[in-house]
Amino acid sequence: IDESQTSLDTGVQRFTSSKIASSVQCFEDTKARIVKLIHKPELSVSTYDTAWVAMVPSPNSSNEPCFPDCLAWLLENQCCDGSWACPHHHPFLKKDVLSSTLACILALKKWGVGEEQINKGARFIEVNFASATEKSQISPTGFDIIFPAMLDYARDLFLDLRLEPTTFDNLIFRRDLELKRCYESHREAYLAYIAEGMGKLQDWESVMKYQRKNGSLFNSPSTTAAAFIALPNSGCLSYLHSALKKFGNAVPAAYPLDVYSRLRTVDNLESLGISRYFQKEIQQVLDETYRWWLQGSEEIFLDASTCALAFRTLRMNGYNVTSDAITKLLPDSFCGNMKDIGTTLELYRASEFILYPDEKDLEQQNLRLKDILEQELSSGFIHSEVNRALNYPFYAIMDRVAKRRNIEHYNFDNTRILKTSYCSPNFANKDFLFLSVEDFNNCQAMHREELKGKMRWVTENRLDELKFARSKSAYCYFSAAATFFAPDLSDARMSWAKNGVLTTVVDDFFDVGGSEEELKQLIRLVEIWDLDAITECSSQNVQIIFSSLKRTISEIGDKGFKLQGRSVTNHIIEIWLDLLYSMMKEAEWARDNHAPPMDDYISNAYVSFALGPIVLPCLYLVGPKLSEEMVRHSECHTLFRLMSTCGRLLNDIQTCERELKDGKLNAIPLYMINSGGETSKEAATQEMKSLIDRQRQELLRLVLTREGSLLPKPCKELFWHMSTVLHLFYCKDDGFTSQDLIKVVNEVIHEPVVLN
């Protein structure tokens, strides 16, 4: 029996080891595919655009095609049903398929080839013609103008299409209505973009003013081809040759698109929480993008989505980019239409990154875009994305919470719509999702083990015996795990969480648990820093609190010493003493019924809010080596002050009524008192909210700015992480009591991501 059991155990071990090895290899293979995508973006070809390129006549003879290989490609790529649908064809993209199919048979008919394919294509259009006016179908950009124009061209080529008259009349009515709207709103750029749909109405000389340095019109092969057909131009021809040289015998819907594709990949990796696996590749993309930004690259600045994405990505990664380019991108100037919610959403996200007081235009744009998104919530997969962007601004959602929501709502359908549909695995794909789910669940398993250790620490230090103290151990750990989650930051998480518990205990001790003498005893013990100084006159509560402080601070100090190569314990003690002194001052103000001047209150309250012991010791544990000069520098203190002031005021707004009843100091009534009673509660609250906005804006600027900064980025990010924690905790109730928060804690720590 023993031998059989041993054999069974060995077999299980081999199976388990093999399974782990296979999983690791799968993980590595996925990473390798993503790296390849970053270096070499992929983009689908477009039958619609290829058809228009195929219509281009040779510069040497108008009776011969300039690109016969495109014609051959069309002949070889017709679908069995007679259409020229793309592989990513969606049932709601029938208008796109109709448009592409009609363009293809026009190209074949023009050059007198492929009669069989033309007949099959014509039959498909006739059978599916009703879809051209169905409201449930997604309309490609300019469809209502371009499709009727191509039908006119089909008639000129004597292409016999038996179309249902009512649907045809409806199409013509829509075209005329759309053209009228465009002319009335002076949408010249939009009409130039869909120039192939304007026919004889088009002023091609005016269209050519939109020609780019690469010879194209709007980086669109179809627009450029139509322009060359109407008005031969060497730049247009050179552009078409370059597109075919890159893609073979067919062209994409937009080219070049490398900048956008790479940035979209980076955005995917960052939003799903897996960017740390690709730091080298991402840095290369960011540096290249910044170089193109400084050079005024048309690929960035002449496309609203690319410009917005580049601005947001560069600014959030510390690059010095001004907002001028973004504020010039007004919603009604998009080269498309205002139903392009994707571009609107991209611009809205970019406009949230306001760093300077003089960026009023960016503020105004943010408000305008928010109104547009609220009024025109789109249907389909992007609907939930818009809701999340509006309900959870980037400064009010913790990193891991955002990552989980992004994973759960991730749509790996990478189809996008311009004048036709196109797709790219750089926009979205299953590899991104697989890697993010694996990583999230692996990190979460580690977090659960850390939380168990944290709960043991509470018991070992007898903190559970303090009846006056709120039990917030899980929440304190959650705020750490939800902000800096990587496996190598375990020591920083535990320091954050343990000090979070201790500050809660001390805060409750000063509020309700301790007498004046006990408070003074605790401060004296921390000043002396000697366990032997705990005498019989010290209460049990004081003994438990000080012993816990002594052990925990010493433990964190030891870990800090190993990472920093110097002693940091005295600095951590000093941080705690600053907190205790500020709490004592508040206790004295309350005891004396004293209402201090607002400035005095704020200068003490941002310290007494108790974030110092939570955040500042973590600076030593997140990786970079810090000199004494760095941690004592005004930059570090300013970051701490801004973060803590935001937190204190957020708390005061939410707890005003309760703290008034409890006789505690609060910024709202103090502001009213200091104004001589001339300010209402509503006005005082609004002023505090405005102050929070200004402080948060300055905090973000300091965190993101690299030039002239002494603190390393991982250290500065701790202050921003805590700011997001505070905005979530105090967004509704007084933080800890919110049922929403309980749900979020479970999602981050206890419930693995399971995909259907």
Curated annotation (Swiss-Prot):
<dbReference type="GO" id="GO:0000287">
    <property type="term" value="F:magnesium ion binding"/>
</dbReference>
<dbReference type="InterPro" id="IPR005630">
    <property type="entry name" value="Terpene_synthase_metal-bd"/>
</dbReference>
<dbReference type="Pfam" id="PF01397">
    <property type="entry name" value="Terpene_synth"/>
</dbReference>
<dbReference type="GO" id="GO:0009686">
    <property type="term" value="P:gibberellin biosynthetic process"/>
</dbReference>
<feature type="binding site">
    <location>
        <position position="511"/>
    </location>
    <ligand>
        <name>Mg(2+) 2</name>
    </ligand>
</feature>
<feature type="binding site">
    <location>
        <position position="651"/>
    </location>
    <ligand>
        <name>Mg(2+) 3</name>
    </ligand>
</feature>
<dbReference type="GO" id="GO:0031969">
    <property type="term" value="C:chloroplast membrane"/>
</dbReference>
<protein>
    <recommendedName>
        <fullName>Ent-kaurene synthase, chloroplastic</fullName>
        <ecNumber>4.2.3.19</ecNumber>
    </recommendedName>
</protein>
<dbReference type="InterPro" id="IPR008930">
    <property type="entry name" value="Terpenoid_cyclase/PrenylTrfase"/>
</dbReference>
<feature type="transmembrane region" description="Helical">
    <location>
        <begin position="606"/>
        <end position="622"/>
    </location>
</feature>
<feature type="binding site">
    <location>
        <position position="655"/>
    </location>
    <ligand>
        <name>Mg(2+) 3</name>
    </ligand>
</feature>
<dbReference type="InterPro" id="IPR008949">
    <property type="entry name" value="Isoprenoid_synthase_dom_sf"/>
</dbReference>
<keyword id="KW-0456">Lyase</keyword>
<dbReference type="GO" id="GO:0009899">
    <property type="term" value="F:ent-kaurene synthase activity"/>
</dbReference>
<keyword id="KW-0812">Transmembrane</keyword>
<feature type="binding site">
    <location>
        <position position="507"/>
    </location>
    <ligand>
        <name>Mg(2+) 1</name>
    </ligand>
</feature>
<feature type="binding site">
    <location>
        <position position="511"/>
    </location>
    <ligand>
        <name>Mg(2+) 1</name>
    </ligand>
</feature>
<keyword id="KW-0150">Chloroplast</keyword>
<dbReference type="Pfam" id="PF03936">
    <property type="entry name" value="Terpene_synth_C"/>
</dbReference>
<keyword id="KW-0460">Magnesium</keyword>
<dbReference type="InterPro" id="IPR050148">
    <property type="entry name" value="Terpene_synthase-like"/>
</dbReference>
<dbReference type="InterPro" id="IPR001906">
    <property type="entry name" value="Terpene_synth_N"/>
</dbReference>
<dbReference type="InterPro" id="IPR036965">
    <property type="entry name" value="Terpene_synth_N_sf"/>
</dbReference>
<keyword id="KW-0479">Metal-binding</keyword>
<comment type="function">
    <text>Involved in the biosynthesis of labdane-type diterpenoid including marrubiin and other labdane-related furanoid diterpenoids with potential applications as anti-diabetics, analgesics or vasorelaxants. Terpene synthase that produces ent-kaurene from ent-copalyl diphosphate (ent-CPP).</text>
</comment>
<feature type="binding site">
    <location>
        <position position="507"/>
    </location>
    <ligand>
        <name>Mg(2+) 2</name>
    </ligand>
</feature>
<dbReference type="InterPro" id="IPR044814">
    <property type="entry name" value="Terpene_cyclase_plant_C1"/>
</dbReference>
<keyword id="KW-1133">Transmembrane helix</keyword>
<keyword id="KW-0472">Membrane</keyword>
<comment type="pathway">
    <text>Plant hormone biosynthesis; gibberellin biosynthesis.</text>
</comment>
<comment type="similarity">
    <text>Belongs to the terpene synthase family.</text>
</comment>
<keyword id="KW-0934">Plastid</keyword>
<feature type="short sequence motif" description="DDXXD motif">
    <location>
        <begin position="507"/>
        <end position="511"/>
    </location>
</feature>
<feature type="binding site">
    <location>
        <position position="659"/>
    </location>
    <ligand>
        <name>Mg(2+) 3</name>
    </ligand>
</feature>
